[in-house]
Amino acid sequence: MRNGLATLATLATLVLVAAGCLAGASALAEPLSCGVVLMHGKWGMPQSPYLKPVVQKLEPTCQVKLLEMPWSRWRLYDKPYADAQAQIRQAVSEFRQSGVQWVAVGGQSFGANASLAYMAQVGDADAVLPMAPGHVPENFYLISDVRRGIDAAQQAVQAGQGDTLVDMTDMNQGQRRQVKASAAALWSYFDPQGLGNMALSARSFRKPVPVFWAIGTLDPLYPSGSAAIYQQLPAHADSQYLVVQANHANTPEAASEALWLWVKARTGR
């Protein structure tokens, strides 16, 4: 009888232990709530048609914030790059304050550039999602009519006249546009060795985080520097470099399915 009671007690203990293990496993497997801050490209807007397929894929899984950045078609560098970084930081903070556990920053073209700069300057995101990264000030400086404006902005800043308005030729995928903005703002974006330099940002991440990098075979950056910039990033086992058959504009759409699966894998959703 005593042996029988001992056996029952042992079985009961095993059942309780097993139940505890299952409960622990369930807790560990609980999906992370997730939020994604997405930024449009140069001269674009928050409701970018290029980002729309990505938003549609992500929204059933994650909350998405779409920001209007200082390089939008209406703002045209009305604030320096540091202000853009503060804007991203505010969006990330809002997610955190609402209880979101996993927060990524990303975007298309200039928005991708900003996500890299953000991790170098602030570094509090859990992942980075650069798609068709763009805005390459070190290359723009080689173009004479663009360089004139950049030099004028730099000279004004060095003279303590950062509020001076400067006329400059801006470039976007071969298109030119005349812009006028403060010297301080223009220099912050177009300094060849400044925040807009993606290779410098990549090697300056404040911490290693997983990066989902998407580039199209028809994107000008694909043969000229995309992989080299990616290789500057701190190594992370979950990072992915995805090449898609697409141009600069439709790379996010071509990568949207892979991005969605990648985010789900990171968050357990």
Regions found by a protein language model. Name each.
Residues 31-59, 69-70:
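Short, surface-exposed "cap/lid" segments of acyl-processing enzymes
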Residues 106-111, 115:
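Gly/Ala-rich beta-loop-alpha elbow adjacent to hydrolase catalytic centers
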Residues 129-140:
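Active-site nucleophile loop of the alpha/beta-hydrolase fold
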Residues 77, 246-256:
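Catalytic histidine-centered segment of alpha/beta-hydrolase-like enzymes
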